[in-house]
């Protein structure tokens, strides 16, 4: 799961206007360089070195860049101690969930229209949703997740609309026959209306049609019940530390 997450966040943020990445054994840093913690991530797993971890944390702190440190279970509690010593705050236990290959059909609110994003208008619509769902500045979202992302063979972004208005968005990253699910969001004023279920089940059904056989995601508390309903099961729980403010907790 650690390696899949590394590959996925690199794909997810790779089209950001100010994208920057660095890697060491057991460590992957992927930065949009936007002032939004949820768009800058350091992933920590087995084999990571304490000194390299500290150096990567300091490289972000020295620039006053908000970011998340996502520590997988294979990394010892010593990494948590280093994060705390450097002033990061513990945000949450963050479960990663997997859904293996079982049949799936679109469900949820049938009045929601789902499209696979392809044009600038769709990028703007997705940004509107993420701005509402996660309190992110829209200009930061558009720079971090631009329309050029749609041209990547490793990514699809799906947008949900009702009456022409954007109400949901989700990003899928592809890794062989495995798919990562990221930036799943519903407009804050339209939650609990079956939009998220319709959006995600439709996107996943299309991915299965295209040959995907396994899905994984990191589950926020707000989305956990939806993911369980769709057959996801927790396979490990990471520890998330933050410098700045996160809306993943």
How would you name each of these model-derived features?
Residues 76-90, 197, 221-237, 244:
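Conserved active-site alpha-helix within GNAT-family acetyltransferase domains
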Residues 15-17, 65-66, 91-94, 149-159, ...:
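A short helix-loop-beta-strand connector motif used in the catalytic cores of GNAT acetyltransferases and
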Residues 35-41, 91, 174-182, 191:
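A conserved beta-turn-beta hairpin within the catalytic core of GNAT-like acetyltransferases
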Residues 63-73, 207-219:
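Conserved GNAT acetyl-CoA-binding A-motif
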Residues 1-64, 75-76:
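N-terminal charged segments
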Residues 138-189:
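A conserved beta-strand-loop-helix scaffold within acyl/acetyltransferase catalytic domains
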Residues 50-57, 186-188, 192-205, 209, ...:
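Conserved acetyl-CoA-binding loop-helix of GNAT-fold acetyltransferases
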């Amino acid at each position: 799961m650690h390696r899949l997450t590394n590959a996925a966040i690199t794909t997810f943020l790779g089209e950001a206007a100010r994208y920057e990445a660095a890697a060491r054994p057991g460590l992957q840093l992927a930065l949009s360089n936007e002032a939004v913690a949820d768009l800058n991530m350091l992933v920590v797993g087995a084999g990571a070195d304490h000194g390299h971890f500290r150096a990567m944390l300091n490289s972000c702190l020295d620039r006053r860049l908000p970011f998340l440190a996502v520590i997988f279970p294979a990394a010892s509690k010593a990494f948590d101690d280093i994060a705390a010593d450097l002033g990061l705050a513990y945000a949450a236990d963050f479960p990663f969930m997997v859904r293996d290959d079982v049949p799936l059909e679109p469900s949820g609110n049938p009045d929601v229209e789902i499209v696979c994003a392809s044009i600038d208008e769709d990028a703007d619509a997705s940004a509107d949703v993420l701005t509402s769902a996660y309190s992110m500045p829209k200009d930061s979202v558009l720079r971090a997740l631009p329309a050029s992302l749609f041209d990547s063979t490793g990514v699809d972004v799906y947008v949900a609309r009702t009456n022409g208005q954007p109400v949901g968005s989700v990003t899928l990253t592809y890794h062989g026959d495995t798919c990562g699910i990221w930036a799943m969001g519903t407009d804050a004023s339209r939650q609990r209306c079956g939009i998220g279920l319709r959006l995600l089940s439709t996107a996943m059904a299309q991915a299965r049609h295209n040959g995907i056989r396994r899905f994984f995601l990191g589950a926020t508390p707000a989305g956990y019940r939806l993911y369980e309903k769709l057959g996801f099961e927790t396979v490990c729980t990471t520890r998330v530390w933050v410098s700045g403010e996160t809306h993943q907790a």
